[in-house]
Curated annotation (Swiss-Prot):
This is ATP-dependent helicase/deoxyribonuclease subunit B. The gene is rexB. One of its GO terms (biological process) is double-strand break repair via homologous recombination. Keywords: ATP-binding, DNA damage, DNA repair, DNA-binding, Exonuclease, Helicase, Hydrolase, Nuclease, Nucleotide-binding. It comes from Latilactobacillus sakei subsp. sakei (strain 23K). Disulfide bonds: none annotated. The heterodimer acts as both an ATP-dependent DNA helicase and an ATP-dependent, dual-direction single-stranded exonuclease. Recognizes the chi site generating a DNA molecule suitable for the initiation of homologous recombination. This subunit has 5' -> 3' nuclease activity but not helicase activity. GO terms for molecular function: 5'-3' exonuclease activity; ATP binding; double-stranded DNA binding; helicase activity; hydrolase activity, acting on acid anhydrides. It comes from the Bacteria. Its cofactor is Mg(2+). Despite having helicase-like domains, this subunit does not have helicase activity. The lineage of its organism: Bacteria, Bacillati, Bacillota, Bacilli, Lactobacillales.
Length: 1186
């Protein structure tokens, strides 16, 4: 028979030449068979094109039963569909992975390099791909053995790799024999089958390939021996006697020509004279691009005179990918509206579509452009896949919160009789309670119901009928899980083989209606005319069924141990890997649509305009990395040792890089008239991109101007607006906002656009809505008196910390305490929980020693340890601290908390040996807190008979008596380092200590009834911690203490009291009775050699009065502002740039943007204690600071 080549560069129409030849032969021999072979993904378009070409001038219809357009695998179906071989089951990628997984386990003792790799994620899939590459390249296990024998002594690792590949490949071939067919084996089988057939009446026309695998070349050799074969190559000339140099621009096509030519000679097949495609398919501009590109990539490239290409070559730089894709959509729509183009005339190409994947649908939908994206979409994200993974994870991780919720949120397991809306609402309630109480593990399996309670300052734990109803709904979900999953897991545990595991899983899914729910989803998608989505549920279920069949066939007889947890995990991983490799079959929904694809995929040549998007130096040329088991170095070593076999492997990274100019050349010339090169200048996240060197070379040669596209429409643009009504509305809003900011008029063309959008029924409502946003200012409105009264009444009962929050940000106060918004409660140990724990323990500890009438200085270490252990045991029983008993991690944290409490208790004892200050009372209430009352609260009358009542709880009140003069001080426990900040006190951010001190002084009779003239000692912070010392902190004095074993004394200054201290010499002497001079280890002051005391924390009684008076003013001013309805969005900004927004849970509500003129931080000045006191004295009108 014969072989004929159709050659020519990309400028020429190889398709037309082949179809013309086919048509001529068909008219001469209409009874013979004709096959047009193309890559699979362009088969449909090629068939349509060929049928169009075969129509006669007189008849619009053509009967072409003798003409078939096939891919190579479809050709196998055509010839072999009725043979016994073709009836053997196909094996999927998932099945291949399962088979390779089994082979690795069976042969692990023989393996040298791969023995321990089976457990590594991704290795099985990587090995499977390598085996398929060897099979496609027709490299047998015997070839691998020969390769290994030819390696030198220095190539030990490669020899081990080939040794293991030989073992697995041999076992792979044996396991597949007559049991399964995988797609690559079909080509071999077809070749063998056709060798036994008569094909003299057949004609084969091959187009769209630049190279063939070894399998495909063997098939073509068989075809040319028995039939007429014509192959079209984009190739500048013939290479009958010698393949081109590796750096030759047409290397791939030239090498393929040479190999096929040599096969024809070897098999005595006549080679017809080459036919040069002579029909120019490109405009002169693109033909000039063809000449230039080929010339520039060829040695000694000759100078070419540029031709006018302005209307057919464009280079466009957009601000980001979003602006780039919007420009492409706008341009396509503009060109279609000229009436000269249809949507099917456009092709959008890029090297990798992934960076654009999230933008394609919204932008093209906005511009009302029908499109088809031929990027394969995997099934990994389908809810069925998540259901299967989480169904097994719940068992593997024993009802972990994340797994149970993910399982239920697939919405494939729903209680019978419950609507999807009811299920979602109940599941949300259930999840909230789970997060609040930390339910997981055995909590799902207990017999008693979970209880829903409301807790808060305004709902004191009282249960209502509504609470009971919500409790029932929540437990409906819990009972469903309890009734559904445990029986399934018991059945899984009882399974003895892989086959039984599959039976249990399949029956569970059928019994619970998963298959019916998937069909329901399909019907919903069809009803909504979502054709692509409608096919996904059935395709995913079908893939799953095939994987189960393959698992049973390959691993069904594998025994499962009694504790089969690890084997079930492997089963889950095999399913996950299978779905990750499985892809949806994609069907174009219409003929007239824009196609998006990647430049590495072959395209038909009938389109008019190509947009090469993403033309940056990152991907053009692409940065190629070889991830196969046989690395580039391995391939080079094999090439050096085994030159005949190695070329049958896939190209190395270097070979693929060398092919980049040719691959992009095909993409540049994929359409007939025009090409747009577009690229983003950045990714919108700070990364800048450069133009592709390929495009830069083209631009320089043809002297093209780069068109710049901004992210937003320009106010100065005079162009007529283009786009759909939805895209025009987006652009109009941008232009209007710019005009508003620049205080200029909107251009006339945009005013016209506005009028049209307002008149059109489909756009009228949204236009009105969006234009309202132009007048929106991100600033809260002042509350009306009615709303204020409704929220707060006429009395504000508040803790002082709430008012501190008001001074941090008024709007945050309104959200939290006016609207009572709160974050969803989560079962975790927060800093607040830790603080409550410390407060509870210290309260119990002080009250215990007071109740037993034990003097703190008299306690020894053993007594303290016993007392602390008693206190901790009772504290752990409190419901709010049950989290400490929940997990092993919490157990560790509990140990740390216990060590801290013991260390603090020892520190209190040690401090008591050096001070006369003694704890008097702990956790002292003032004002009304819930149903409890304590000391008299601070009440402040405001205008309009309104009142602020401050309440709270003082951690500890200490007492000291000097010469019958009682002193009272307050102590506030902190879990982090604190000191009194005069600036924060001045701005209302630190009201607590002064308020507590004023409360104690105000109600001193209730504290010390027998005394009438109590003086303040100070207000102190105590940092509760288990301290560690750095080397820098180990002074000579501390080293001496350490050597003497005085460890407690060495750590004494780690528990120093910081805060306000009254500057009273007699008082200070009694606060630290052992201080001779230097820094006190107990309090934040030092004693000079002169006998005087020094500290920035010292204040006189007069200064303390000033601070407390200012504190009162701040409380009253906050109350006045709250009752006035002030809700300003005014977060504070400290001099160190920390601000009130950093940790706020309401940031998504604030929408605070410092770039907006109405959003401003309230800047705090950097005031020290002297500056604060001076301002307070000035406010009082007294210049005396003492």
């Amino acid at each position: 028979m014969s072989l004929k080549f159709i050659l020519g560069t990309a400028s020429y129409d190889h398709h037309q030449a082949l179809v013309t030849n086919l048509k001529a032969t068909f008219q001469e021999k209409p009874q013979e068979r004709y096959f047009y072979l193309v890559p699979n993904h362009i088969k449909f378009e090629s068939e349509v094109s060929i049928l169009e070409a075969l129509k006669s001038d007189e008849n619009d219809y053509v009967a072409a039963s003798q003409i078939q357009v096939f891919s190579l695998t479809r050709l196998a179906w055509y010839f072999m569909k009725n043979t016994p071989y073709y009836q053997i089951p196909r094996i999927s990628t998932a099945g291949l992975n399962m088979l390779v997984f089994r082979l690795l386990q069976e042969h692990q003792e023989q393996l040298q390099l791969f023995r321990g790799e089976v457990r590594h994620t991704g290795f099985v899939a990587q090995l499977t791909k390598q085996l398929l590459e060897l099979k496609i390249g027709c490299i047998t296990p015997a070839d691998l053995t020969a390769m290994a024998e030819n390696l030198g002594d220095q190539q030990v690792e490669l020899a081990k790799k080939l040794h293991d590949l030989t073992i697995i490949a041999t076992a792979f071939e044996a396991a597949m024999q007559k049991r399964f067919i995988e797609n690559t084996a079909l080509i071999d089988a077809l070749t063998l089958f056709l060798q036994q057939q008569t094909l003299t009446d057949c004609h084969f026309y091959v187009e769209g390939f630049a190279q063939f695998t070894a399998q495909e070349q063997a098939l073509l050799t068989t075809l040319m021996q028995q039939s007429e074969v014509q192959i079209g190559f984009i190739l500048d000339r013939a290479y009958p006697n010698q393949q081109p140099d590796g750096l030759n621009f047409f290397f791939q096509a030239g090498r393929t020509y040479y190999n096929l030519y040599q096969q024809a000679r070897l098999n005595h097949v006549p080679v017809m004279m080459d036919q040069m495609a002579d029909s120019q398919r490109l405009t002169p501009a693109l033909a000039a691009l063809d000449q230039f590109w080929v010339s520039s990539e060829s040695p000694g490239n000759r100078k070419l005179s540029p031709v006018p290409v302005a209307d057919h070559l464009h280079v466009v730089a957009a601000e980001n990918r979003y602006a780039e894709l919007r420009y492409v959509a706008r341009e396509i729509r503009r060109l279609v509206q000229t009436g000269h183009y249809r949507y099917r005339d456009f092709l959008i190409l890029t090297r990798h579509l992934a960076p654009y994947q999230t933008m394609i649908a919204p932008i093209l939908t906005e511009y009302e452009i029908p499109y088809f994206c031929d990027l394969p979409q995997t099934m990994a994200a389908h809810p069925l896949v998540s259901l299967l993974e989480k169904l097994l994870d719940v068992n593997l991780h024993f009802y972990r919160y994340e797994d149970v919720m993910a399982l239920l949120k697939t919405e494939l397991l729903i209680p019978k009789g419950m609507s999807i809306a009811e299920f979602r609402a109940d599941l949300d309630l259930c999840e909230n309670l789970i997060l609040k109480n930390g339910y997981e593990g055995k909590d799902w399996l207990n017999d008693f119901d979970w209880q829903f309670y409301r807790f808060g300052s305004y709902q004191e734990g009282t249960r209502t009928t509504q609470d009971e109803a919500l409790t029932e709904r929540i437990n409906g979900i819990r009972r469903y899980v309890q009734a559904t999953l445990p029986p399934f897991y018991r059945a899984l545990k009882a399974a003895k083989t892989g086959r039984q595991v599959v039976q249990v899983l399949y029956q569970f899914l059928i019994d619970h209606g998963v298959d019916r729910q998937l069909l329901h989803w399909r019907d919903q998608a069809l009803a909504a005319n979502q054709v692509a989505q409608a096919g996904q549920p059935e395709q995913t279920w079908s893939t799953f069924m095939q994987m189960l069949d393959e698992y049973v066939t390959l691993l069904g007889d594998v025994s499962f141990e009694e504790d089969n947890t690890e084997q079930l995990n492997e089963f889950k991983q095999l399913l996950s890997a299978g779905f990750a490799a499985a892809q949806y079959a994609q069907i174009p929904s219409t003929l007239d649509q824009v196609v998006l694809s990647e430049s590495g995929m072959v395209q038909t040549k009938k389109r008019q305009i190509t947009f090469m998007i993403g033309s940056t130096d990152q991907v053009m040329p692409d940065q190629i990395e070889n991830t196969a088991l046989l690395t580039d170095q391995d391939r080079q070593r094999l090439l050096d040792n085994e030159g005949q076999v190695t070329p049958l492997l896939n190209e190395s990274s270097v070979g693929k890089m060398n092919a980049e100019p040719y691959l992009n050349y095909l993409a540049f010339l994929s359409s007939q008239t025009t090409v747009y090169f577009t690229y983003p200048l950045g990714n919108g996240e700070g990364t800048a991109f450069k133009i592709s060197p390929y495009v830069e070379r083209i631009r320089n040669h043809f002297d093209l101007t780069i068109q710049k596209i901004a992210a937003e429409q320009s106010l100065q643009s005079t162009e007529t607006p283009q786009g759909s009504w939805r895209s025009l509305l987006s652009d109009l809003i941008q232009v209007s906002r710019q005009a508003q900011e620049n205080q200029t008029l909107i251009p006339e063309q945009w005013l016209t656009t506005y009028r049209l959008l307002q008149q059109a029924p489909q756009s009228q409502f949204l236009t009105t809505q969006l234009f309202q946003s132009l007048n929106y200012r991100n600033e809260p409105e002042r509350l009306t008196p009615e709303i204020v009264t409704g929220l707060y009444g006429n009395e504000i009962h508040t803790s002082i910390s709430k008012l501190e929050e008001f001074y941090q940000n008024q709007y945050a106060y309104f959200l939290k305490y006016g609207l009572k918004l709160q974050e969803r409660p989560v079962f975790e140990l927060t800093p607040a929980n830790t603080g409550n724990f410390y407060h509870e323990v210290m309260d119990r500890f002080i009250k215990l020693i007071q109740g037993q009438q034990i003097a703190l200085p008299e306690l020894d270490d053993q007594q303290i340890d016993k007392l602390v252990s008693e206190v901790l045991a009772k504290t752990y029983e409190q419901p709010e601290f049950k989290i400490l008993n929940k997990t092993a991690r919490m157990g560790y944290i509990r140990q740390q908390l216990m060590q801290t409490v013991k260390r603090v208790s020892l520190a209190l004892r040690n401090q008591s040996l050096s001070t006369n200050l003694r704890p008097l009372a702990t956790e002292v209430l003032f004002g009304q807190v819930g149903a409890e009352k304590g000391l008299q609260g601070l009440n402040f009358m405001l205008d309009d008979h309104r009142e602020v009542k401050v309440r709270g709880k003082i951690d500890r009140i200490d007492q000291l008596t000097i010469n019958n003069q009682p002193y009272l001080g307050i102590v506030d426990y902190k879990s982090s380092q604190h000191s009194f900040n005069f600036r924060d006190a001045y701005y209302g951010l630190a009201l607590q200590m002064l308020t507590y001190l004023e409360t104690v002084l105000q109600d001193q009779q209730a504290i010390l009834p027998a005394n009438s003239a109590v003086k303040p000692a100070g207000a102190f912070y105590l940092h509760l911690k288990n301290p560690t010392l750095t080397l820098k902190q180990l002074t000579k004095k501390k080293m001496g203490q350490l050597q003497k074993g005085e460890f407690d004394q060495m750590l004494l200054d780690q528990f120093k009291y910081n805060g306000l201290i009254v500057n009273d010499e007699e008082l200070l002497e009694n606060l630290d009775t052992t201080l001779v001079n230097g820094q006190s280890p107990l309090f934040a002051f030092s004693k000079l050699k002169s006998g005087k005391f020094s500290s920035k924390q010292l204040v006189t009684l007069n200064q303390l009065d000033l601070l407390m008076a200012h504190n009162e003013d701040l409380i009253k001013e906050a109350g006045q502002a709250i009752f006035a309805g002030d809700t300003a969005l005014n977060p504070i900004m400290r001099p160190d740039r920390t601000n009130a927004l950093t940790l706020s849970p309401f940031k998504s509500i604030f929408q605070f943007d410092a770039m907006l003129p109405e959003n401003n931080y309230r800047q705090l000045e950097a005031l020290d204690e002297k500056a604060v006191l001076e301002r307070l004295m000035s406010k009082k009108g007294d210049g005396n600071l003492e």
